[in-house]
Amino acid sequence: MSLDHTQLPVGIFFMQAQEQVVFGRPAAQAVLEQVERMGARRVFLTSGRTLGQLDDGPLQRIRRALGDRHCGTWSQIRAHSPREDVIDGALAAREAGADLLVAVGGGSVIDATKAMLMAIWMKLDTPADMAPYRNNQPQGEARPVEAPVDAIRMLAVSTTLSASEFTPNAGVTESQTHTKQSYSHRLMVPVTAILDPQATLDTPPDLLFNTAIRAVDHAVESFCSPRANPATEPLSLQGWRLLARSLPAIQADPTDLDARLKAQFGMWQAIAGSVAGARTGASHGIGYALGATFDIAHGHTSCVMLPAVLRWNAAVNADRQRLLSEAVGQPDVPAADLVAALVARLGLPGSLRDVGVGPEHFADIAKRALVYVNLRDNPRPITRIDEVIEILELAV
């Protein structure tokens, strides 16, 4: 028996400040129960413009259920959560005297609402005020996000499969430079995430499926992560398995609420390993650069980049990738091919050409991508522009 710790895996499993996940119940009922549990009296709703314009969508049903507890709605959040939308929403919530925020929407809405919490806590009034609090600041320039003792919190009702409701991080876009900025605080994670498959029925299929491939990206990259461990691996693998099976079922029958709930469970499992410490890699890092620069949906960046990254990484982790193939009963099919086939089956873009990106953009994308730590956390670490370009060429 060896008593030498140097032979043991070393890591930290991060627990989130999330109290509950409510699943399989009507969102309006679940929100009202959570509001009553928390003793909130002035509830402020956030969403994107499309949901805000529905006559009887999840936002409208929640608003009716809240009755006189509803103190306002901000339905102007755009894709990629621009800083301007964060500040405008925070000012509106502050003016309304909100004591609880409820985000109803996809990743951009939930991320923006998390950043709104920070803006309310720190009394930020302009987009520029946010800059000192972003992650990965140069040494000496960063300011910590501080939540007051009675910090306003949020609930999240997801209408997509982005999984933003399970993380304490907010991805926000700086419009002038087209760069994605990350903000985080442990209390920015929603107190409760509500998974109601019915709330996804009004989501266009392309949006639902492209966020689903983003969830696949979470599962696959966290499973392949050098920081994966026996606690995170089952989460990532089950997330991939559930998504690979449920998404074709949803495509075959869009009204199948059981398949939609299984996809929500898959999305939840997929992100769980990542936020616990098994970090994502180059597909995410390059995807951040693509999304912010060319206004490409995060899910579409995963559709395009994940197969290419898997192929590039296979030189160092082919055995690991085979476990992904075995998990869905196809051990002899490369994981990259399985992901690409799922993307194609769902009618999503499968190449950079499909999203309007050509070789003339590669050098700029590579330069922007290198700032993201995900590239250094990749199973095959990336530190040079030419390495990013190699991957981009696999995605043409």
Annotate each PLM feature.
Residues 98-116, 159-164, 293-296:
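Glycine/serine-rich anion-binding loops at beta->alpha junctions
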Residues 325-396:
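C-terminal charged capping/lid subdomain of soluble metabolic enzymes
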Residues 60-61, 89-90, 109-123, 167-168:
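Short Gly/Thr/Asp-enriched flexible loops that form oxyanion-binding sites at enzyme active sites
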Residues 1-100, 352, 386:
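ATP/NTP phosphate-donor binding region
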Residues 222-338:
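Active-site segments that bind and position negatively charged phosphate/pyrophosphate groups
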Residues 28-32, 54-56, 83-86, 108-113, ...:
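Short glycine/serine/threonine-rich phosphate/pyrophosphate-binding segments
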Residues 24, 45, 82, 107, ...:
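Buried hydrophobic positions in well-ordered alpha/beta secondary-structure cores of metabolic enzymes
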Residues 122-230, 320-323:
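A glycine/threonine-rich phosphate-anchoring loop and its flanking beta-alpha core
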